[in-house]
């Protein structure tokens, strides 16, 4: 297994493991206890100085290995590896809360890297890559490590973690690999900087944040829609919330009876269709509008409620910039609860009325669209939705906000 925050040391370890025909394990979490919990998945853990002490039988520091290596470096070419035989395991959030292992081969990643270069090779050429996302996950692995390596493009070994760092490093030769988690935090910045290009993936990017990124960084972000299981599916630059997604040209798609998209993709399996839980509307053979996840449907008092629809109805109100809706167990019943980020108009409205009247106003508006059972009964107002560095919602943090 490889777990580092240093992308240079990660690249050395990754290529060495591939050359040695090893099965590569990429934990998605840097925390020592989480790494120890995955120890049955690997024989040896390769780390850098950023990783704390881990209770694993064989832990090796990559920099120490490099510093103490006494053999002469090889100058001849290494023998080619069979990419289809080099296996890789990544981890994604499982519905049970336990990390879910996703298996791929380097051949899958090689095909996807070639597709990225086909689409945007000219954007990368002659520039350098900065990133705000981890290489331990598939988006960062592809966009900040493998694609630059295969294209001979330099990349930063450390993450940019704050909006001001993005702006201080930004120039016309910088391509930024980012996520909604950080791009949304640019809203309070006033300085501008011209980048060569911006990519975003890992979660939905609000239209307001996409336009703010264009104002500050010179480009609408290229959003990439996909998952650990599927790899990239489609991309867009969001002029409006209804801007359709464009399939990568090596992928075929169709809808099942529930209007969920299924894929025939070389990133997964060339011969078998892969069914997703993403509800879509096909607007052409290779473009679609994303409606939401059908697996975010719950039952409350025997009625099916789509959490995605409730969020959509809240966010179409002029007072709400962004929200998340979750089921919440009260002693006697299951209800919906929502964490809200107010728009400027919403903040002004909230300041002129009591909290109770504001909630009543929201509920009154939602009744135009939703059954009473689907209207959230608890609300919390925050400055931003809790997200991890990949742009995924931090459910435990959201639950704590509701309980507080």
PLM region spans:
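Gly/Ser/Thr-rich phosphate-binding loop
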Residues: 187-241
């Amino acid at each position: 297994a490889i777990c580092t925050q240093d992308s240079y040391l990660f690249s050395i370890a990754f290529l060495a493991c591939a050359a040695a025909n090893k099965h590569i394990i990429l934990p998605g979490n840097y925390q020592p206890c989480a790494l120890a919990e995955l120890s049955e998945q690997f024989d040896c853990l390769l780390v850098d100085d950023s990783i704390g002490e881990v209770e694993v039988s064989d832990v090796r520091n990559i920099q120490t290995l490099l510093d103490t290596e006494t053999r002469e470096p090889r100058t001849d070419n290494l023998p080619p590896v069979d990419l289809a035989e080099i296996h890789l395991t990544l981890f994604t959030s499982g519905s049970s809360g336990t990390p879910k292992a996703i298996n791929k081969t380097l051949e899958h990643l090689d095909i996807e890297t070639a597709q990225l270069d086909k689409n945007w090779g000219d954007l990368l050429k002659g520039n350098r890559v900065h990133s705000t996302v981890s290489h331990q996950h598939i988006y960062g692995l592809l966009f900040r490590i493998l694609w630059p390596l295969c294209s001979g493009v330099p990349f930063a070994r450390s993450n940019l973690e704050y909006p001001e760092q993005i702006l201080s490093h930004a120039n016309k030769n910088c391509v930024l690999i980012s996520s909604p988690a950080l791009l949304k935090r640019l809203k309070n910045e006033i300085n501008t900087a011209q980048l060569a290009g911006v990519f975003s993936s890992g979660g939905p990017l609000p239209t307001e944040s996409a336009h703010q990124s264009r104002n500050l960084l010179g480009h609408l972000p290229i959003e990439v829609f996909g998952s650990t299981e599927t790899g990239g599916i489609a991309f867009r630059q969001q002029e409006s919330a209804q801007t359709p997604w464009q399939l990568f040209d090596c992928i075929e798609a169709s809808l099942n009876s529930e209007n969920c998209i299924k894929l025939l993709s070389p990133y997964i399996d060339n011969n078998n269709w892969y069914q997703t839980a993403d509800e879509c509307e096909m607007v052409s053979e290779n473009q679609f509008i994303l409606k939401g996840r059908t697996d975010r449907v719950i039952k409350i008092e025997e009625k099916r409620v789509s959490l995605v629809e409730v969020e959509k109805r809240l966010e179409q109100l002029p007072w709400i910039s962004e929200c998340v809706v979750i089921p919440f167990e009260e002693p006697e019943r299951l209800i919906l609860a929502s964490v809200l980020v107010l728009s400027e108009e919403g903040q002004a409205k909230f300041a002129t009325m009591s909290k109770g009247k504001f909630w009543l106003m929201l509920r009154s508006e939602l009744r135009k669209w939703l059954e009473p059972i689907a209207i959230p009964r608890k609300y919390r107002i925050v400055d931003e939705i809790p997200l991890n560095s990949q742009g995924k919602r931090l459910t435990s943090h959201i639950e704590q906000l509701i309980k507080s």
